[in-house]
Amino acid sequence: MTVSEIHIPNSLLDRDCTTLSRHVLQQLNSFGADAQDLSAIMNRIALAGKLIARRLSRAGLMADVLGFTGETNVQGESVKKMDVFANDVFISVFKQSGLVCRLASEEMEKPYYIPENCPIGRYTLLYDPIDGSSNVDINLNVGSIFAIRQQEGDDLDGSASDLLANGDKQIAAGYILYGPSTILVYSLGSGVHSFILDPSLGEFILAQENIRIPNHGPIYSTNEGNFWQWDEALRDYTRYVHRHEGYTARYSGALVGDIHRILMQGGVFLYPGTEKNPDGKLRLLYETAPLAFLVEQAGGRASDGQKRLLDLIPSKLHQRTPAIIGSAEDVKLVESFISDHKQRQGN
């Protein structure tokens, strides 16, 4: 058989030829001309993901990759060496890009402002450089989360107060999952799309377009080690799924991995508040708002148990929030346990 006799379906060729860069440009056709910088921003995010993925693939072979730095971050959490590396990668990739004016990370107390001697853009990148970094030392999946917002006002006082806005202000959001393959999932507000990094090409190639989360799914993902620290409503919900067939518990300790599973298979991710931390653990600007943006674009639902996550307005950059994210029916079910419990308390 000659090469000319080999039949390759056009659909396969189209998908194989659709890089992240090409796809983003297609998505931006419906945007104004002033939004074209978003394509370059996405390319830079992809570059950061490639650099982090390469580092992770050699984590057990290189020095200064595994373990802790001995420092704590703004949340009082011990900082892993990969946290520092990944955060520095994002800064290095964007510092002289001329695309952003600030980078806000959960690893930094205040945003990083692009120096005046560098070209300065009008967008802000908010990100969690490495989510689930405790998994790095044992070779389990981790991820990066990102969101893009446009600067509003001049921010002359360096307070970044314009970032204290609801999640609907996000122009784009996504995550990169570092697992058996490296997957980038993003949305510009018109569907959710996933790309797999082809190591031989060094390109993110379209894997799935217009992802739709099932309306109901079998997965419930939560750390049941906190069971006795939750409100009674959440304990009642957990007892409910224990008693009913068709539910499966899956929890990896990496938010991106758990959300990706639910996006693909359906179900619900829960990180409620506890007696010790009533506002939960997850950061609104860097974690839950970007993921809520994605899940809603895929037809899902995201709330703090009472309010839509994208409606929440933070009062500080590192504000935390409880999170219930996933299939619409499953999130509504959890919310119903919470509302019923409040009604009983009211009576």
UniProtKB/Swiss-Prot annotation:
Q: In which pathway does it act?
A: Carbohydrate biosynthesis; Calvin cycle
Q: What class of enzyme is it?
A: hydrolase
Top-level lineage group: Bacteria
Instruction: Enumerate the residues binding substrate.
Output: 131-134, 223, 251, 281
Q: GO:BP terms for this protein?
A: fructose 1,6-bisphosphate metabolic process; fructose 6-phosphate metabolic process; fructose metabolic process; gluconeogenesis; reductive pentose-phosphate cycle
Alphabetized NCBIfam families for the sequence: PRK09293.1-1
Put simply, this protein is called Fructose-1,6-bisphosphatase class 1
The taxonomy runs: Bacteria, Bacillati, Cyanobacteriota, Cyanophyceae, Synechococcales
